[in-house]
């Protein structure tokens, strides 16, 4: 039986927004609404969906960057023998949790301090957690720069972020994340702002590091091709809810939910003569059905560990 590095149960994140400048009335936006998933050690889950569906909000809640409204998030205990709720963490345990869960942000141009050298940027988490002495920390920086392909490291350590290309900056972001030797990394579209020519090299780097360092990923993307390349499983998110989740090849070859079918049919095909079915989905009707039937019932297994939301989707295709 597989051991999970993280288990998410009925996670919710709501925001209150004002109805207008002169109005005191507030409405609740359900950015993340009752989602459940788990990620085993050494595996990656792709979280896909359109912009604004709640992917990044989910990531920030898992990393304790934003407080969740409800639900449970259980992370593996430091001894690896049991799970522990992140709500119970405090003091030294909370500090260890932050070492074991890290995040790679989308924009390498904004996630690095422009006034710091590359050496200082990567040293920062080691300094915060007081890991090793100065010589050991500098040696660790040199080793991780070599690991992410920035060699020789002594040429990069004194540089500033503006002196690097986009791909090199993202490698620095990855180095800063992995120098803590985390067990779980949230990747918020880390290749979406990079040129296509270097995107594949960054993804290959992340896959190799995941294998070598036994890291699990939650990989957020709107690109199904990227999710297929990076992930063991894919969860499809729509308006704050997960509507379908399955093994990667199972989901892409046998999509069931109409929104998943619509996403897959929107993938560009290089052959202009290729005739494929395009699914036309009434999103307003779909959203109302999910709101009506999807909140208080668990997802159902339709076989091959392929789960789908239990609302009625007939007639929506």
What kind of feature is each model-predicted range?
Residues 2-4, 18-22, 28, 83, ...:
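Short catalytic/signature loops enriched in Gly
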Residues 227-229:
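A short, surface-exposed alpha-helical micro-motif characterized by mixed small hydrophobic
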Residues 174, 202:
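Hydrophobic anchor residue at the start of the ABC signature
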Residues 179-183:
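A short, proline-enriched helix->beta-strand linker immediately N-terminal to the Walker B motif
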Residues 159-164, 168:
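Conserved ABC ATPase signature
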Residues 72-96:
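ABC ATPase NBD Q-loop/coupling interface
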